[in-house]
Amino acid sequence: MPPLWALLALGCLRFGSAVNLQPQLASVTFATNNPTLTTVALEKPLCMFDSKEALTGTHEVYLYVLVDSAISRNASVQDSTNTPLGSTFLQTEGGRTGPYKAVAFDLIPCSDLPSLDAIGDVSKASQILNAYLVRVGANGTCLWDPNFQGLCNAPLSAATEYRFKYVLVNMSTGLVEDQTLWSDPIRTNQLTPYSTIDTWPGRRSGGMIVITSILGSLPFFLLVGFAGAIALSLVDMGSSDGETTHDSQITQEAVPKSLGASESSYTSVNRGPPLDRAEVYSSKLQD
């Protein structure tokens, strides 16, 4: 299986030579949110300009940016002497009146590319991504900093189509040695107004709607159950008070009856002695 850097390089190929290449969007493996409102991440032209033979001397790659138009595909980035243009973001109104140089970076030989096996290492991830990718529009302060020097890689405009071109420059001579084609139009994202965002739950799944309905009605049922429990407790308290009063009345009515029985018993007991005296008296008469 070929190394991953080779696959990335092949992703930029169109016909097989540097002149017939086009800059391509970075793979979603390395740039998930791409393009954004103001930036576009591109794959660097790795192993393209030096694919046939090693280059001698020091070389840099210039990245030019141009707003898409009817003539942008044939726009030139060099003068009649093969000297690369030095137009800036401000001079071209952000690429609307002509191409501007946004980024310049050293051409890394294929043999010196960092291994992608260490992409999982947090301390090395940024270095590896910088070696394989370039982000257009990444500098948000260069336009307003009066002390800024160098290329101003200013933010791009939202909802705008751009074209990009890589140019190989020999730093010893300062001349263009090779270049790619202009890329296909790449459109930056558009900011979605909040008023147009559809928050209606009708776009949710049926299961989500059922769960939302149940959770929404659950507090109501809990409140009804709580109120019912309070009402039942009050009814039970009233019933227990009525039974206590009834028992006390029965007890009070039962007391006189018991007393009456005692009186009758007492009376019967008191009648006992006279009977005994009569028996004694009759016995005396018999004697």
UniProtKB/Swiss-Prot annotation:
- Quick one: where's region Disordered? 242-287
For this protein, the record's InterPro entries field holds: Uroplakin-3, Uroplakin-3a
Please state the protein's primary subcellular location: endoplasmic reticulum
Which ranges does the record list as Lumenal topological domains?
19-207
Outcome when changing G202D: Found in a patient with unilateral multicystic kidney disease; uncertain significance
The transmembrane segments are 208-235
Q: Report biased composition (Polar residues) as residue ranges.
A: 261-270
State the compartments where it is located. Answer: Endoplasmic reticulum membrane
* Involvement in disorder: Mutations in UPK3A have been detected in patients with renal adyplasia suggesting a possible involvement of this gene in kidney and urinary tract anomalies.
Which protein family is it in? Answer: Belongs to the uroplakin-3 family.
User: What is the protein name given in its UniProt record?
Assistant: Uroplakin-3a
Gene name, per UniProt, is UPK3A
